[in-house]
């Protein structure tokens, strides 16, 4: 569950400035609306706008403080769009009045409307947009905390690299006894015969052909696990190769994390990283990138949590 941390707001200039401006505008409109209501006739609708904006500002402060804006971005834009309508109607009800307090209240709603427009543009943009990327980069990585992490933000249907661990399926083990009788005794067009009764069926390098009884004797038969990973001779599993993806030697790209991410504990190939952390990336194709942290730790990372530098 996301944890609220005030440092996430204090360390983010965009969140700090916009929330401060919105709260100043709301306080200005609240005080002047109270004074105007005491002095004389006051449109009751404006109180709904004041209440709605207070709840909206508090909600956005919680979202920014817990770094869950990427989870609630669509809902945030919807609430802000409604709030922009309410503040605009409140301005229209107050700005044309000759009372100085009502005009001051209208000024407070105008300030809130300006902040709402900025928020709609920010939360309505994708993390890969240039403006959104610039605002995200303005936050210091040193002030970032692991306040929000999701171990499974992306489903496996996005083309995630499959491993014997992440597949959650027992590997299919085949021994020579199980394969007995499946050898091809009749030659097929374009393929050499692998029958064991053919004396000329020796391998090119003096070994028995693949699929022959000689090649599949107990203790020599290669066992294949799920995903086509060879488990060695005689069915012995090599733990260093069965559960890990081969590591590249070069990382020509650099990427910056736009969100925090915690690796799935059931998959040793994933890595965890914090927001604004810089990673070296070897390949930017696909939805999961092979990345390397500054500490030397390597693994796969979801591409929609990263932005290329």
From Swiss-Prot:
<feature type="topological domain" description="Extracellular">
    <location>
        <begin position="92"/>
        <end position="103"/>
    </location>
</feature>
<dbReference type="GO" id="GO:0005886">
    <property type="term" value="C:plasma membrane"/>
</dbReference>
<keyword id="KW-1003">Cell membrane</keyword>
<keyword id="KW-0346">Stress response</keyword>
<feature type="transmembrane region" description="Helical">
    <location>
        <begin position="71"/>
        <end position="91"/>
    </location>
</feature>
<dbReference type="InterPro" id="IPR001452">
    <property type="entry name" value="SH3_domain"/>
</dbReference>
<protein>
    <recommendedName>
        <fullName>High osmolarity signaling protein SHO1</fullName>
    </recommendedName>
</protein>
<dbReference type="InterPro" id="IPR035522">
    <property type="entry name" value="Sho1_SH3"/>
</dbReference>
<feature type="compositionally biased region" description="Polar residues">
    <location>
        <begin position="150"/>
        <end position="175"/>
    </location>
</feature>
<dbReference type="Pfam" id="PF00018">
    <property type="entry name" value="SH3_1"/>
</dbReference>
<dbReference type="InterPro" id="IPR036028">
    <property type="entry name" value="SH3-like_dom_sf"/>
</dbReference>
<keyword id="KW-0728">SH3 domain</keyword>
<keyword id="KW-0472">Membrane</keyword>
<comment type="subunit">
    <text>Forms homooligomers.</text>
</comment>
<comment type="similarity">
    <text>Belongs to the SHO1 family.</text>
</comment>
<feature type="transmembrane region" description="Helical">
    <location>
        <begin position="45"/>
        <end position="65"/>
    </location>
</feature>
<feature type="topological domain" description="Cytoplasmic">
    <location>
        <begin position="125"/>
        <end position="309"/>
    </location>
</feature>
<feature type="topological domain" description="Cytoplasmic">
    <location>
        <begin position="66"/>
        <end position="70"/>
    </location>
</feature>
<feature type="region of interest" description="Disordered">
    <location>
        <begin position="134"/>
        <end position="175"/>
    </location>
</feature>
<feature type="topological domain" description="Extracellular">
    <location>
        <begin position="36"/>
        <end position="44"/>
    </location>
</feature>
<feature type="topological domain" description="Cytoplasmic">
    <location>
        <begin position="1"/>
        <end position="14"/>
    </location>
</feature>
<keyword id="KW-1133">Transmembrane helix</keyword>
<feature type="domain" description="SH3">
    <location>
        <begin position="250"/>
        <end position="309"/>
    </location>
</feature>
<feature type="transmembrane region" description="Helical">
    <location>
        <begin position="15"/>
        <end position="35"/>
    </location>
</feature>
<feature type="transmembrane region" description="Helical">
    <location>
        <begin position="104"/>
        <end position="124"/>
    </location>
</feature>
<comment type="function">
    <text>Plasma membrane osmosensor that activates the high osmolarity glycerol (HOG) MAPK signaling pathway in response to high osmolarity.</text>
</comment>
<keyword id="KW-0812">Transmembrane</keyword>
């Amino acid at each position: 569950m996301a944890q609220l941390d005030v440092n996430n707001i204090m360390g983010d200039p965009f969140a700090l400035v916009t929330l401060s401006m919105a709260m100043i505008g709301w306080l200005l409109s609240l005080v002047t609306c109270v004074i105007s209501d005491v002095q004389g006739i006051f449109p009751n609708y404006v109180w709904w706008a004041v209440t709605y904006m207070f709840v909206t500002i508090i909600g956005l402060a919680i979202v920014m403080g817990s770094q869950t804006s990427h989870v609630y971005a669509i809902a945030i834009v919807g609430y802000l769009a409604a709030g922009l309508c309410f503040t605009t109607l409140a301005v229209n009800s107050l700005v044309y009045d000759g009372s100085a307090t009502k005009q001051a209240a209208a000024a407070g709603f105008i300030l809130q409307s300006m902040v709402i427009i900025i928020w709609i543009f920010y939360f309505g943009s994708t993390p890969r947009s240039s403006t959104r990327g610039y605002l995200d980069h303005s936050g210091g990585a040193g002030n970032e905390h692991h306040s929000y992490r999701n171990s499974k933000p992306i489903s496996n249907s996005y083309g995630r690299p499959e491993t014997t661990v992440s597949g959650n399926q027992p590997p299919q083990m085949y021994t020579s006894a199980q394969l007995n009788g499946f050898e091809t005794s009749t030659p097929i067009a374009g393929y050499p015969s692998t029958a064991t009764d053919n004396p000329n069926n020796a391998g090119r390098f003096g070994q028995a052909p693949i699929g022959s009884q000689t090649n599949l004797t107990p203790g020599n038969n290669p066992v294949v696990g799920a995903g086509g990973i060879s488990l060695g001779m005689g069915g012995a599993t090599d733990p260093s190769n069965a559960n890990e993806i081969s590591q590249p030697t070069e990382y020509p790209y650099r990427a910056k994390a736009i969100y925090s991410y915690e690796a799935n504990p059931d998959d040793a190939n994933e890595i965890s990283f914090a927001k604004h952390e810089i990673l070296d990336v070897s390949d930017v194709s696909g939805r999961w990138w092979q990345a390397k942290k500054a500490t030397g730790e390597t693994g796969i990372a979801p591409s929609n949590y990263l932005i290329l530098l």
